[in-house]
Amino acid sequence: MNATEAGLDDSITDFSRRRVDVDGVVKTVYVSGDGPGVVLMPEMPGISPDVLRLARWVRDAGFTVYVPSLFGADGAYPTAENGQEVVRRACVSAEFRAFAGGGTSPVTAWLRGLARQAHGECGGPGVGAIGLCFTGNFALTMTLEPSVIAPVVNHPSLPLDDPAGLELGDEDARAVRERVERDGITVLAYRFDNDRWCTGQRFAAYRKLLGDAFDGRVLPGGAARTDPPPFFRDVVQTPHSVTTAHLVDEDGHPTLKARDEIIAYLAARLHS
């Protein structure tokens, strides 16, 4: 039984806790593993036990995983009350662009700097970036950093008020498309078919921007875990988090297959 199944916080004792400075902005990052670097960004409402479970799976597959603290309480079990407060704070934060018309979230510049540092420390052909929910699209924006060569966009939820939006300014969108085309990058993405926070309209917008470079995979909502933590049950209220809160850890399950596909994608690009 993991921490989420037990309703417990995760103490994160198997990661080193670092204070990482990017252009004078300092944030906490949890780091563990050996091998090429992968930046794994948390979903709302923070670095939950399920996010850490995914981080450990990536680490144990032969990567150095970097988990930046961007919002919420690190390691906290996601309750409905606390999660709603984290969402409210993030939506008015200057670091994020939660609503349509806001363009690219400024925090992605810091995350690109983290990717540069990870590549410098770990070497290899480049770095992977996994975004989840609120940070889902950040993995795509991070391809503006040359070291990021393996972006995974999981159930991106921003902008919250535009189901066909991409949380990208026009200039950044053009630059991302050019980078993807120039370097032959494939963008791997996942969502549930009945997710109201990441709809088919959003995936269609990615396809319009990126063409065949966008590999969007859709799982049936009926495959989602039926007893997720309270924040996902009471606030999210829909199948959403394919490889974290709504993952079913059973051999052969579609969500576990998605996890394995992500790890295989990272390995093919970062272990060469």
Name each region found by the language model:
Residues M1-S272:
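N-terminal cap/leader regions of alpha/beta-hydrolase-fold enzymes
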